[in-house]
Regions:
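Alpha-helical transmembrane segments and their immediate juxtamembrane cytosolic regions
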Residues: 1-277
């Protein structure tokens, strides 16, 4: 699989879209068909256990299958099939948006409690990983690189780690969705402005991080100084880059910067688009 460094997601999203295209086609053209009903069935499981339990279990089983032999590789290795499933689950949410928003609005408490429990479990697994030297979260414990661990495929702890890691990530996503829907789902020029900067900030932050590290490490600064000052410099650098790039339509197109409609352009359609931002 082709890797594009920290822009790995571009290539991955293309592959995911390509592989899932038959499902997209069938659901779009046969919205009452068997596959569409099967996907919508996630929201029909009692007590909202579809998105709360079934989907993260499927993600966990992906880790159980692939994580022992494949280490972490920024979107590849065992993460590739995991993100493919996540992409599919996101699609299920989109095509069943009414059921999705009903779930997000009415499952806020269990989502929050689940996030707390999953986070505590994640901290525990991370602590055990540090103590034992087994890459419970990084994967690859049964691969050639970790033959010295003597793990053929799974132990009780590696199985638990697969479920903890998947549930932790999944519930944090739901946590951000549910509280974002409650606190941020309203017209805001500040949110619209910040939304413009998502892609340019992500695209340019890596070279700025490297530049800061090269200079600061050469100067012999401590890790905490590099972290604190480096974070400030990277944020400022990304912000300056964003402000420069958003001023011309060519650079806006290059970095995925959407224009904010002016007051004259705020038709009902545009108001809806602004709220989506």
């Amino acid at each position: 699989l082709l890797s594009l460094g920290h822009l790995w997601f571009i290539w991955s999203l293309f592959q995911y879209s390509l592989f899932l295209l038959p499902i997209f086609y069938v659901v779009r053209n046969y919205p009452e068909g068997r596959i569409a009903r099967l996907l919508a069935g996630v929201f029909k499981i009692p007590f909202r256990l579809g998105p709360l339990l079934l989907l993260p279990i499927i993600l966990s089983l992906s880790d159980v299958l692939f994580k022992p032999l494949m280490g972490e590789a920024i979107g590849f290795g065992y993460e590739w099939p995991w993100y493919l499933l996540t992409f599919l689950f996101g699609y299920i949410f989109i095509v069943n948006k009414e059921q999705y928003f009903e779930f997000i609005d009415n499952a806020r408490i269990p989502i929050t409690l689940g996030t707390i429990v999953a986070t505590l479990a994640f901290i525990w697994i991370k602590t055990e990983e540090f103590k034992s030297g087994v890459p419970y979260l990084g994967g690859g414990w049964a691969g050639d690189e970790h033959k010295h661990l003597g793990i053929d495929y799974h132990t009780n702890m590696t199985l638990i780690a697969c479920f903890v890691g998947s549930f932790h990530t999944w519930f944090w996503c739901l946590f951000l969705f549910t509280w974002g829907a409650k606190l941020l789902n309203k017209p805001s020029k500040h949110l619209a402005y910040l939304n413009q900067g998502v892609y340019p900030f992500y695209i340019i932050h890596q070279p700025i991080v490297y530049a800061v590290l090269i200079v600061f490490l050469a100067k012999g600064f401590s890790d905490i100084v590099i972290l604190l000052i480096g974070t400030i410099l990277v944020t400022i650098g990304c912000w300056v880059f964003f402000e420069i790039m958003k001023r011309h339509w060519i650079t806006r197109a290059m970095y995925g910067i959407k224009e904010i409609p002016t007051s004259k352009e705020k038709t009902p359609e545009n108001r809806s688009r602004i709220e989506d931002n």
